[in-house]
């Protein structure tokens, strides 16, 4: 049974798309690095989609290469040293990804479609930081907003259908190379391939927020 914090999340974004299960390897690799509550969520729900797939729990083992060699190859939180570890734990349907750093808390939000990175300030209480994230997370946290600030998930979901755990909605051409954020430009992509494509388009020009 999920804790009261994740229950709040599920009320907003119900369990929708089953993903791969959490294994003993995940538990061994990440116990002590991420909060116990996150491992409990993995064990109960696996790396699955919520709210029709607008939000996902991320498998950090499966994302290891994409995290270290693709997305974060040139990103370092200004408050953290070179050896800081960034563990992806949640993502949106359009690829926005949230990272946890052991001993710090939630550290980064990366939105590759736009080429933006947000550096989080340290939380007031690290022991509740992960639970607070899920309690406060609604659909808008994971959605993508077009140039008119209108949320796109429902329209794209209706147009393309549901995502699987290793898929992402993206735009072709990409936004950083002149593409438009509209439903007709949206496509389904294999997530790691698309992340690598977006990273190439960003080059050295990440937009820093926060």
Where are these regions (language model features)?
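Noncatalytic linker/hinge segments flanking ATPase motor cores
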Residues: 79-81, 95-102, 128-141, 150-153
């Amino acid at each position: 049974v999920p804790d009261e914090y994740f229950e709040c999340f599920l009320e907003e974004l119900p369990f929708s798309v089953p993903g791969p299960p959490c294994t003993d390897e995940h538990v061994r690799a990440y116990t002590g690095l991420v909060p116990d509550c996150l491992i409990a969520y993995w064990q109960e729900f696996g790396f699955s989609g919520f709210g029709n797939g607008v939000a996902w729990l991320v498998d950090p083992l499966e994302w290891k290469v994409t995290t270290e060699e693709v997305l974060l190859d040139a990103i370092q939180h200004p408050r953290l040293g070179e050896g800081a570890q960034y563990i992806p734990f949640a993502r949106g349907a359009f690829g926005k990804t949230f990272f946890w750093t052991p001993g710090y808390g939630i550290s980064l939000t990366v939105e590759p479609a736009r080429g933006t990175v947000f550096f989080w300030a340290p939380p007031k209480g690290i022991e509740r930081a992960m639970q607070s994230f899920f309690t406060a997370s609604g659909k808008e946290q994971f959605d993508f907003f077009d140039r008119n600030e209108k949320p796109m998930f429902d329209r794209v979901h209706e147009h393309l259908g549901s995502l699987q755990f290793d898929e992402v909605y993206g735009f072709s051409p990409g936004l950083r190379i002149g593409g438009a954020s509209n439903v007709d430009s949206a496509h389904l992509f294999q997530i790691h391939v698309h992340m690598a494509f977006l990273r190439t388009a960003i080059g050295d020009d990440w937009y820093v927020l926060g």
